[in-house]
From Swiss-Prot:
It comes from the Bacteria. GO terms for biological process: polysaccharide biosynthetic process. Keywords: Exopolysaccharide synthesis, Transferase. Belongs to the stealth family. This is Exopolysaccharide phosphotransferase cps2G. GO terms for molecular function: transferase activity, transferring phosphorus-containing groups.
Length: 337
């Protein structure tokens, strides 16, 4: 197992899966306009491209050279700089993983719930959004234990509804509560749910003990580790929910998300505890903090979340972002032409 602790591939293959869309692509915009309502057109902020995706690949090449394979899931889009001749990367079109009658789709929740259908995907894989970046050296042990369990943190939390997306979180928790007794889960696996690695966040779980059902888990916006067999099992247990979400072309209050599979891994103790502070989520408006974290490597992983800022401000912020990544990762990676 010594190799697993170093920067080698370890005793089993680990793949990376990342979703990406170029929201400025005219062909894609025309396709989206055919199916979208006015409200959905106004949600275009979710599809804005930062222009930094090549740095995602450069970070993988530099900080996780041990990764077995990278699967890029797109909708008939391939970055013009990506070297598709590289045997370590595969571009997966939605047609390869989604039901035919669900296409085209513009619902990331639907796409995420079907990534286990990727041909050739390894049993152990890590899922990234395209706004999640490796920020310094990582090892397989950051994502999986030596016996193949995903690394995660089972910190409990409560839903504080603000937007439609919170309905989806409630949908996930509802299915968990319908199938698992909270107190039985905690009694069987106390040290998975109350662990020194969680630090002061254990207080949240303690405060929620009087509630007889799960109210939510903390959802750190970092790459998530999965086992494909567990992913498939959960979806087969909830085929109706899977099918409904898969056929919602746009985000819908009735959707379930990939966090359902994560929650299942937690309540069945099919994970090993990891600090929840391994990564950090920033809103794009927090540019000073983002630049500092990128330059210092404070966190191993960061998420740079878009928010409702004007296009002028967005352009200025992404310009700073590109400059910062260019300085940190100036060399082309093996994934580029």
């Amino acid at each position: 197992m010594r190799g697993f602790l170093m920067f080698t591939s370890g005793p089993f293959d680990i793949d990376f899966v990342v979703l990406w869309v170029d929201g400025s692509d005219e062909k894609w915009l025309q396709k989206r306009a055919i199916y979208s309502s006015t409200k959905q057109q106004n949600n275009a902020v979710r599809f804005r491209d930062y222009g930094i995706f090549k740095y995602w690949f450069r970070a993988v090449a530099k900080y996780a050279p041990w990764v077995h394979h990278v699967y890029l899931v797109t909708d008939e889009q391939i970055p013009n700089w990506l070297s598709i001749q590289n045997s370590k990367v595969s571009v997966i079109d939605h047609k390869s993983i989604m039901p035919e009658d669900a296409l085209p789709t513009f619902n990331s929740s639907a796409i995420e719930l079907n990534i286990a259908n990727i041909p050739g995907l390894s049993e152990h894989f890590v899922y990234f959004n395209d706004d999640m970046f490796l920020n310094r050296q990582v090892t397989p042990m950051d994502f999986f234990s030596e016996d193949g369990l995903p690394k995660d943190s089972a910190v409990q939390n409560a839903i504080m509804p603000v937007e439609d997306f919170d309905h989806m979180t409630a949908n996930n928790v509802m299915l968990i509560n319908q199938n698992f007794n909270k107190y039985q889960v905690l009694r069987r696996h106390p040290f998975r749910f109350f662990n020194f690695r969680y630090g002061f966040l254990n207080v949240l779980s303690i405060c929620l003990l009087p509630w007889p059902r799960f109210t939510r888990f903390q959802d750190p916006h970092v790459p998530i580790s999965f086992r494909k067999s567990v992913f498939e099992k959960v979806l087969n247990l909830h085929r109706d929910a899977w099918n409904e979400t898969s056929h919602n072309r746009f985000r819908n209050r009735n959707d379930n998300t990939i966090w359902l599979i994560r929650y299942y891994q937690l309540v069945t103790a099919q994970f090993n505890p990891r600090t929840p502070f391994v990564g950090k989520k920033y809103n794009i408006g927090e540019m000073k903090k983002i630049v500092n974290d990128i330059n210092t490597g404070k966190h191993k992983m960061i998420c740079i979340n878009d928010q409702n800022v004007s296009m002028a401000e967005f352009d200025n912020l992404t310009k700073q972002l590109r400059s910062t990544f260019r300085s940190k990762l100036p060399q082309k990676s093996e994934f580029e032409k």
